[in-house]
Every structure is written in C-alpha cells, then in structure tokens.
C-alpha cells in the first residue's frame, strides 16, 4: 500500500480489498484500508484453520516427511515453500517484502505458520533436516528468500 493507492492492484484484489482499488465514491484512506485488511485477515485466518492443504500437496509432503524423517514444523515449512513457489500471487506478495535477514525470515514464517520462532529457526538452520536434505534452505546472500530444492 502506498500513500494514495496500492502498489499492486492484483494483490489488493486477491486479499479482498477490491472495493478500495480506484474508489470513485470515497477518498483512499490508509487507516481505513488497513482496518479493512485486518478485518479480512481475521476472517481468512478462521477459514484457513478449517481448510486442509490440497490433497496432492498434503500427500506429497507426507511422503517426503516419511522418507526424510521430517517433523510437523518441517512439513509446514515445506508445504509453505511449495505454495510460495507455485502460486504467482503469493510469490509476488513475498517479493514485496524485499530483502529480509535470516532472523526476519524465521520470525515471519513463525507468525504465518503459527509455530514458535525457535522451532522455525531450528528447522531452517544448517543442521535442520530441510537444509541437510536439500528440500528448503534460506538464501543467506541477502535476499532472505526461501529456496525450494536448491540443489537442482
């Protein structure tokens, strides 16, 4: 969100703020848009808590978890990384965060996945199974991006 509009209208539309894209009947007010966004977030969080992952993704994550020995936090991070790399809008939204430090990546993932920061840090650390197996690593070159299957 910028001062008088959205940086990306397609992302605003995707998160349910389409009535604020070029509003003709009112002035774009950041505080009102932010309040609408938080209201939408509360609703979406409740909906998502009830919604499982797509069956194929869940199946594949479970198979990899069994093969590699991933725990529940590893599985959630892996599933999120897959979604991040396969959903263009989610990837674009993540790109808007620009460069994140490793610590900021851990904190953001912990918040998004509703798991303790320390568990995310351990899962994505160099000794974590995700990194050792080559499934997911954090790009430490400055971008802070999650890299899925970095060994390809």
Predicted regions and their residues:
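Intrinsically disordered, low-complexity N-terminal extensions of AAA+/P-loop NTPases
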Residues: 1-152
């Amino acid at each position: 969100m910028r001062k008088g509009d959205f940086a990306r209208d397609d992302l605003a539309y995707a998160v349910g703020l389409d009535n604020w894209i070029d509003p003709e009947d009112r002035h774009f007010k950041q505080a009102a848009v932010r309040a609408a966004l938080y209201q939408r977030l509360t609703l979406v969080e409740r909906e998502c808590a009830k919604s499982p992952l797509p069956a194929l993704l869940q199946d594949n994550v479970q198979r990899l978890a069994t093969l590699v020995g991933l725990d529940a936090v590893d599985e959630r991070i892996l599933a999120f990384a897959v979604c991040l790399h396969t959903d263009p809008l989610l990837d674009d939204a993540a790109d808007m965060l620009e460069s994140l430090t490793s610590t900021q990546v851990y904190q953001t993932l912990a918040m998004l996945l509703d798991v303790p920061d320390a568990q995310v840090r351990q899962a994505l650390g160099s000794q974590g199974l995700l990194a050792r197996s080559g499934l997911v690593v954090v790009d430490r070159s400055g971008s802070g991006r999650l890299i899925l299957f970095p060994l390809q």
